[in-house]
Amino acid sequence: MYQSLALAASPRQAAYADSGSFLHAPGAGSPMFVPPARVPSMLSYLSGCEPSPQPPELAARPGWAQTATADSSAFGPGSPHPPAAHPPGATAFPFAHSPSGPGSGGSAGGRDGSAYQGALLPREQFAAPLGRPVGTSYSATYPAYVSPDVAQSWTAGPFDGSVLHGLPGRRPTFVSDFLEEFPGEGRECVNCGALSTPLWRRDGTGHYLCNACGLYHKMNGVNRPLVRPQKRLSSSRRAGLCCTNCHTTNTTLWRRNSEGEPVCNACGLYMKLHGVPRPLAMKKESIQTRKRKPKTIAKARGSSGSTRNASASPSAVASTDSSAATSKAKPSLASPVCPGPSMAPQASGQEDDSLAPGHLEFKFEPEDFAFPSTAPSPQAGLRGALRQEAWCALALA
């Protein structure tokens, strides 16, 4: 299986036949010694594992061939860190490697076997310091990657060291600037003396100001005045104003005449409407106000007038109809038997009954009127005419 990893032929392998060449050089800077027999094996691994014939020097020494085969098996295709390439004469090896089995070279010659075992002894001495047991820590930091200033700060806690506070661009008083935005106890505004405010501010000298004084100073550039300005007097009581015409000081509105002099509301309106100054006899001490009528009374009167007109309109129609019926009934009732004056009040009373809502026709009693038996046709014609007129009046209503 590992025959392809055989050592390649090298012109300098004959120089390593002597056991003296396996000794560690006193002035070498490498911590361990690598046998020259491994260098060709590593070169053959890096060259693509090409098969090559075994040289006659290694064929005569079966111990070296078995050692090279055992060493090459440690660097298989699945190894994550293949060895670096070195020249054939190099003596440096970058990492520690476990020694091979002691029985691998048992069949070799005495001189070759003792030389290989002697070469393994220096390697065993340097293998222990290079290996780091599990659970241990490094004794010192890496000076090539970590500067001395930062390495000293790593020994402290995550927030207690000088790294956090030594960063550039950070002010050491950022905590006080942050806390000044919150209301604190024992503070007093240097301008107005306020002890409580939603937001404490500072002026240019660092003194505390309340929110109102701080905003006033920020917007206007001066201190906030402590005395409140007096309220503006009303127009009716402005100091120093007097009407030029009537010399009054009480008015609801100050006006100006054509010359620009102040006048009261009454004198100004009189001059505007009439074109002449207001007479002094019309001056009043009290201000006259308008007597406005409430809107509810006007609405109530308007609604009552409309209801009256609506109720009067049906009666007018009924009266016209009744007058027409009376004018037609009077000539028919006039006869030589019945006197006229006695018939007129009766007809008017019947007309009033016909206007009532429950009576739709005229009723005549036979004992009130004496009609001859020889003339029944006029009475029958009168009743038919009265019924027709009553129906017409009902239809019109």
UniProtKB/Swiss-Prot annotation:
Record annotation: effect of changing G184V: In CHTD5; uncertain significance
Composition-biased stretches (Low complexity): 87-101, 310-335
BP GO annotations: aortic valve morphogenesis; cardiac muscle tissue development; cell fate commitment; cellular response to BMP stimulus; cellular response to hydrogen peroxide; cellular response to nitric oxide; endocardial cushion fusion; heart induction
Compartments, record wording: Nucleus
Protein name: Transcription factor GATA-5
Outcome of swapping Y138F: In CHTD5; decreased transcriptional activity
GO MF terms held by the record: DNA-binding transcription factor activity; DNA-binding transcription factor activity, RNA polymerase II-specific; RNA polymerase II cis-regulatory region sequence-specific DNA binding; sequence-specific double-stranded DNA binding; transcription cis-regulatory region binding; zinc ion binding
InterPro entries: GATA_N, TF_GATA_4/5/6, Transcription_factor_GATA, Znf_GATA, Znf_NHR/GATA
Result of altering Y16D: In CHTD5; decreased transcriptional activity
UniProt biased composition (Gly residues): 102-112
Region (Disordered): 48-116, 281-356
Native source organism of the sequence: Homo sapiens (Human)
Functional summary from the UniProt entry: Transcription factor required during cardiovascular development. Plays an important role in the transcriptional program(s) that underlies smooth muscle cell diversity. Binds to the functionally important CEF-1 nuclear protein binding site in the cardiac-specific slow/cardiac troponin C transcriptional enhancer.
Pfam families, per the entry: GATA, GATA-N
Gene (UniProt): GATA5
Residues in GATA-type zinc fingers: 189-213, 243-267
Sorted UniProt keywords: Activator, Disease variant, DNA-binding, Metal-binding, Nucleus, Repeat, Transcription, Transcription regulation, Zinc, Zinc-finger
Basic residues compositional bias, start-end: 289-298
The keyword DNA-binding belongs to this UniProt entry's keyword annotation: yes
Effect after changing N223H: In CHTD5; uncertain significance
Associated disorder: Congenital heart defects, multiple types, 5: A disorder characterized by congenital developmental abnormalities involving structures of the heart. Common defects include transposition of the great arteries, aortic stenosis, atrial septal defect, ventricular septal defect, pulmonic stenosis, patent ductus arteriosus, and tetralogy of Fallot. Some patients also have cardiac arrhythmias, which may be due to the anatomic defect itself or to surgical interventions. CHTD5 inheritance can be autosomal dominant or recessive.
